[in-house]
Amino acid sequence: MSLLTPLRGLLLACITLGGQAMAGEPLKLEAYNPGHAAIFPVSSVIVSGAHDAILVDAQFGKGQAEQVVERLRASGKQLTTIYVSHGDPDYYFGLDTLTQAFPKARVVASAATVEHIRKTMDAKLAYWGPQMGADKPARLVVPQVLEGNRLELEGQALEVVGLDGPQPDRSFVWIPSIKAVVGGVVVSEHIHVWMADTQTAKSHADWLSTLTKIEQLAPRTVIPGHYLGDSSRSLDAVRFTAGYIRDFDTEAAKAADSAALIAAMKQRYPNLADESSLELGAKVAKGEMKW
């Protein structure tokens, strides 16, 4: 046997150990969702490494954003980045509070999300501000455009999936090193799914395609963007969302008006919370309301 053989083995072992060291320890997830205590039960997810952290989504009200600040400070990790996954205000109104607490953290979002925010933020604040009272933001923070489709935390990737697809404003975050999905706007659980923003058959087909893509990744963990109660943190949330979309389309095609559609969906899902989302979505679907 050549003397080079054991040397090659030693070299390969060193390369392997070096790669593991560069990758760092497994990332950890902490989800904060205010549930019934807030207008929107939206998820903010802290992704932590050994020393640093990335926050996905910034909450809606000041009080809820302060809860995220407390959790970040308690973690002892340095917040390097806040990533905003969608352009609706429950994903970014809390940036005012978070950027005051962590002024060195960069705030980024996809180009589609930044465009959405810029076009709608003044109208959204005018509508929601009076309802939020002391929880409304003192100022609106617009993220910078994320370059590319990934973030990095201590050598491990957070991939934004869907930016090159038909719905770049409805993407999700995939963390391959721990096989986890932060679902954002595309995944809900234990709640009537928000349908008002997707008003065409194609938009629903594209949404279902995104959910299929999540299933194909076979994640071990899925954190829904909106949920009430305890989340399964699994593909059950993805399957629930897909089933709801299909059922909504089936009943919308048969219903004479929004009242009939609402009744049919309540019969299919008698125990779901947030009926106001169903009522608004049904009115939009049946042409009784513009959104």
Q: Which ranges hold each PLM region?
A:
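Bacterial N-terminal signal peptides that target proteins for export
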Residues: 1-11
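Conserved beta-strand hairpin/beta-sheet module of binuclear metal-dependent hydrolase folds
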Residues: 25-74, 172-185
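N-terminal signal peptide c-region/cleavage motif recognized by signal peptidases
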Residues: 16-20
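Short acidic-hydrophobic surface loop/beta-edge motif
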Residues: 47, 148-153
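Metallo-beta-lactamase
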Residues: 60-61, 161-165, 169-239, 244-247
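Accessory terminal helices/loops
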Residues: 11, 216-221, 228-291
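Active-site HxH/HxHxD metal-binding segment of metal-dependent hydrolases
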Residues: 74-150
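A mature extracytoplasmic/lumenal domain signature
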Residues: 34-36, 58-62, 83-88, 111-113, ...
